[in-house]
């Protein structure tokens, strides 16, 4: 679904004149369950300072308009939630833009303790990043980090058990495929543990670790990363799609394991967080195993003075102190991912192992949360990408810069 500039302008005007609303809409009490309705709508615009690739193409090789830009609806999430009867909670979410199910699960809280529960259905796995486990509407930057998008395991159907308290927690899950048809497959399990030795208002220190192990889908996996712009079709960093070549992971790959480490520090209006992930792919028929990794470090400053909260091992974003003026944030992130595990064979057009490429990026961002339901984001992203070409027998580079804007309405 494409949005014209006129449509985006109308959406902005509607956001400016709409009255403030609550964070969720209470619907009814059905079967002793308090049912509420939530939603999230995001519209994105990208303008590319291209290097070698036209990222303005909706489909690679089909864009001939000469415009290095994209504008489109990013998310249109509709979510029903229920509390009760008793200690039961449930959720059913769907993204009408991406045509996929979101969280769709039932949770039972032991002793009505939010930190001690069992959950069945589709949910974000403990093998995801802390960034992924946080609410999407409060992400610090328009694009999530490369390890979140490329290495972590997000939503899958399964069961998990969580035990903890306000400042620590342990989670274990077993999962299968994603609920939506033709999405992620491969059964596995995930673990996450976290501890916050300091957990006070405006003063938080958090450490965490995660592990996941899963089967591949039909003995293949494809790891790739977009240039910090979620809607582009072309991905320069890519371990390949061939189902016959030994130099891609899309064949003869048996199991995948990912280890993650995370840290968070909040002091008043300042937040510093970072995450690291390393991935190992066990290969078949004598092929060498593959290893890759990545990390990000980000800092955020609430210019208007608000601070963050803490829940379930993730930071929570506050409402503006002054709804009419809103909450202003300034952020900076460094991000890197390395999908190279091999080397060229000198004098030939062949390689040992898999050379998917390496990407580094810097993102500078400004966010404005207005009242209770609106958010506007501006990002400037500088990307450096490098990958070995067997055709050229040399490394290729693609180093675009991207201006990104997002308008968001949520309730």
Language-model features, listed with the residues they occupy:
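Outer-membrane beta-barrel pore domains
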Residues: 26, 30, 52-53, 64-65, ...
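Gram-negative bacterial Sec-dependent N-terminal signal peptides
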Residues: 1-23
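N-terminal low-complexity, intrinsically disordered patches enriched in charged
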Residues: 18-20, 48, 283
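Short hydrophobic/aromatic segments of transmembrane alpha-helices and their interfaces
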Residues: 5-6, 72, 151-152, 357-358, ...
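Domain-scale selection of a single, long terminal region
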Residues: 2-9, 186-193, 199-218, 252-271, ...
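Outer membrane beta-barrel
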Residues: 25-54, 60-217, 293, 301-322, ...
């Amino acid at each position: 679904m494409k949005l014209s500039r006129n449509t985006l302008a109308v959406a902005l005007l509607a956001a400016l004149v709409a009255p403030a609303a609550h964070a969720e809409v209470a619907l009814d009490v059905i079967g002793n369950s308090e049912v509420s309705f939530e939603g999230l709508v995001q519209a994105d615009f990208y303008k590319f300072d291209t290097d070698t690739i036209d990222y303005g193409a909706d489909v690679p090789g089909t864009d001939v308009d000469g415009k290095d830009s994209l504008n489109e609806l990013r998310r249109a999430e509709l979510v029903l939630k229920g509390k009760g009867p008793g200690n039961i909670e449930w959720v059913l979410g769907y993204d009408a833009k991406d045509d996929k199910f979101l969280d769709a699960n039932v949770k039972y809280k032991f002793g009505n303790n939010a930190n001690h529960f069992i959950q069945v259905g589709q949910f974000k796995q403990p093998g995801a990043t802390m960034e992924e486990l946080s609410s999407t509407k409060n992400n610090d930057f328009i694009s999530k980090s490369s390890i979140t998008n490329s290495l972590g395991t997000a939503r899958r159907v399964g069961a998990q058990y969580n035990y903890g308290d306000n400042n620590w927690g342990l989670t274990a899950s077993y999962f299968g495929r994603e609920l939506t048809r033709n999405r992620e497959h491969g059964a596995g399990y995930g673990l996450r543990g976290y501890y916050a030795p300091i957990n006070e208002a405006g003063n938080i220190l958090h450490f965490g670790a995660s592990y996941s192990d899963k089967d591949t889908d039909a003995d293949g996996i494809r790891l790739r990363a977009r240039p910090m712009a979620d809607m582009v079709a072309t991905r320069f960093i890519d371990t390949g799609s061939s189902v016959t070549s030994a130099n891609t992971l899309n064949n003869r790959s048996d199991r995948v394991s990912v280890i993650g480490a995370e840290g968070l520090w909040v002091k008043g209006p300042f937040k510093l967080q970072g995450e690291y992930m390393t991935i190992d792919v066990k290969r078949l028929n004598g092929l060498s195993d593959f290893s890759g990794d990545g990390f990000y470090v980000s800092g955020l400053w609430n210019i208007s003075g608000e601070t963050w909260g803490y829940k379930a091992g993730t930071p929570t974003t506050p409402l503006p102190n002054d709804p009419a003026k809103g909450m202003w944030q300034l952020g900076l992130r460094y991000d890197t991912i390395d999908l190279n595990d091999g080397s060229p064979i000198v004098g030939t057009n062949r390689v040992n192992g898999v050379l998917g490429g390496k990407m580094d990026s810097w993102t500078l961002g400004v966010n404005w949360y207005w009242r209770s339901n609106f958010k506007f984001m501006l990002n400037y992203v500088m990307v450096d990408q490098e990958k070995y070409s067997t055709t050229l027998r040399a490394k290729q580079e693609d180093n675009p810069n991207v201006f990104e804007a997002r308008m968001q309405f949520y309730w």
